[in-house]
Amino acid sequence: MSTETDEILERLKKITLLEAYELVKQIENTFGVDATIALSASNTNPSILPSKADETVVEEKTEFDVIIQEVPSAKRINVIKTVRSLTTLGLKEAKDLIESVPKVVCEAVSKEVAEETKKLLEEAGASIIIK
């Protein structure tokens, strides 16, 4: 192998699983290939591989809403503090938000942001759903 491919291989060894997943998705989009077919093709008779006409397109959701479902009264102060740290809301607005649940806290955010927001709010004591 050339030194350039050796360097690429060494860099690939150091990336996380999430980064590897994102890299595969970018390669698929850039070159118009499907890694799942390439992986299964090595162990399969090519005549039985699905054609493009047989595939159904399933779009992966990219934007999510984080919704506070319920806040126990004993946890209200912690949830208000967390809402304020996650948003630009003031004290009164954050208090009003948690008193009128279910309410959207974060709208049209990435899956990673939605999961992190959910984790923080659940740690504060709120019941959360992601849609």
Curated annotation (Swiss-Prot):
Protein keywords: Chloroplast, Plastid, Ribonucleoprotein, Ribosomal protein
Gene3D superfamilies in the record: 3.30.1390.10, Single helix bin
GO biological process: translation
GO molecular function, one term: structural constituent of ribosome
UniProt cross-references to SUPFAM superfamilies, sorted A to Z: ClpS-like (SSF54736), Ribosomal protein L7/12, oligomerisation (N-terminal) domain (SSF48300)
Annotated localization: Plastid, Chloroplast
Alphabetized InterPro entries for the sequence: Ribosomal_bL12, Ribosomal_bL12_C, Ribosomal_bL12_C/ClpS-like, Ribosomal_bL12_oligo, Ribosomal_bL12_oligo_N_sf
One GO location term (cellular component): cytosolic large ribosomal subunit
Pfam families listed in its UniProt record: Ribosomal_L12, Ribosomal_L12_N
HAMAP family: Ribosomal_bL12
Subunit structure: Homodimer. Part of the ribosomal stalk of the 50S ribosomal subunit. Forms a multimeric L10(L12)X complex, where L10 forms an elongated spine to which 2 to 4 L12 dimers bind in a sequential fashion. Binds GTP-bound translation factors.
Family: Belongs to the bacterial ribosomal protein bL12 family.
Its job: Forms part of the ribosomal stalk which helps the ribosome interact with GTP-bound translation factors. Is thus essential for accurate translation.
Protein name: Large ribosomal subunit protein bL12c
Organism: Euglena gracilis
